Amino acid sequence: MTQQNSLLKDNETLDDLEYNNLKIIQNKSGYKFSTDSVLLANFGRAKQNDVYVDLCSGSAVIAMLFLCKNNIKKAYAVEIQERLADMAQRSILFNNLQDRLSVLNDDLEKVHKTLGVESVDVITVNPPYNEVGETSENDEIAIATHEIKTNLSKIVQSSSKLLKFGGKLFMVHRSDRLASIMYELKKNKLEPKVLRIVYPKKGKAPNLVLIEAKKGAKSGLIIQEPLILNNEDGSETDELKIIYCRK
């Protein structure tokens, strides 16, 4: 039996992350990562010896990409859903990252009890974007995309509790929730330092924001040039090709 067959379960696929030969296990009918995860992994940065945590990690796609892009020695992927955490663990084993990346199948509000208060240098998070309302019939997808098990306020509070003074939080979120994001960050002593607005296509309204916040920092926000994903004809922009290592 090959390593691939031994790690895959029924109804699962092994997908290419298009970076450093990384692969990820996903369920055909469950939650799957999308472009926003790749954008966040490319937007954030860390030093090799930083303690790094990915919250709301899902199948650990951001954690694995960010870990490898920044050559980090030790990291943690936090995911509350058992099946997603299990898939993440098996993806980590497939990519031989088990000595550097650990999965914590836990509520993010309790993670400080495991890792310690103010013990983390860098956090990434691709949180559930949608407030509770009409959700998917698939519980796994609903929890991953809607604020059922957690919400923006709890995520920012937990991040602030985990981060050291001077530690950084990198977040991707819906652009229409930017005001709430900024409010929650500043309320929890996480100063927004860098903002990049993401447009799905030239001529279209933005749909995502990438934000860097720093714990205990002085005020002062840098707004980077817009990130446009697709040209008017629907083709990928050169920058998106570079992010996906296609150029």
Predicted regions and their residues:
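Mobile active-site "lid"/loop adjacent to the S-adenosyl-L-methionine
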Residues: 127-154
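Conserved SAM/SAH cofactor-binding pocket of Class I
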Residues: 43-136
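Conserved Class I SAM-dependent methyltransferase catalytic core
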Residues: 150-206, 210
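Short glycine/threonine-rich catalytic loop with a Thr-x-Gly-x-Asp
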Residues: 31-33, 59, 203
